[in-house]
Design a protein with these regions (language model features):
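Amphipathic alpha-helical segments
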Residues: 1-122, 144-154
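Conserved phosphate/pyrophosphate-binding and hydrolysis machinery centered on Walker-type P-loop NTPases
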Residues: 127
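Short beta-strand-centered segments that line the small-molecule binding cleft or hinge
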Residues: 134
């Protein structure tokens, strides 16, 4: 029986596509967090302004402005959630593309080299370096993903 071992975590995180995506999403997340912090600061200022004006506003006007602030708060929370969900979906989409590509590569490599089984390194207590195909899969995945990215983008 001929067996190979692969470190899937290293492959999934080590491809240029994964690293580029992580960096892109990190930057987008930082930009969004900065924008959200500014929105929160502005919101806090408006709440404080309303508190100060409470004594001089009519009850009707106060309740109207308070209602506007509540709506603004809900809208801001909704936007934060929406951005977080979008970033998460994008990360999962790219991870799925990488995973599908890696699965195909592992199957092709197993057929080429006559492996009867390919096991994940994380499930093993020991495996000789000679049966580790991680680097080969990583190289092939990078090459295949670059081609796909240049055609349609990840």
């Amino acid at each position: 029986t001929k067996i190979a071992v692969i470190d899937m975590q290293m492959v999934m995180n080590g491809t240029e596509a994964a690293q580029d995506t992580q960096e892109k999403l990190r930057q987008e997340g930082e930009e969004a967090n900065k924008r959200f912090a500014e929105m929160e600061e502005s919101f806090k200022q408006r709440v404080e302004d309303l508190r100060r004006k409470k004594e001089i506003l009519s009850e009707e006007k106060y309740l109207e402005e308070e209602s506007e602030l509540r709506k603004l708060y809900r809208d801001q929370q909704s936007e934060v959630q929406s951005v977080n969900e979008r970033l998460s979906r994008e990360y999962k989409r790219v991870q799925k593309q990488i995973s599908d590509e890696v699965d195909d590569i592992v199957q092709d490599l197993a057929k080429e080299r006559g492996y009867d089984a390919v096991l994940r390194r994380g499930y093993l207590m020991y495996a000789s370096k000679s049966v580790d195909i991680t680097e080969e899969v990583l190289k092939r995945a990078d090459s295949a993903l670059k081609k796909k990215m240049s055609k349609k983008g990840l």
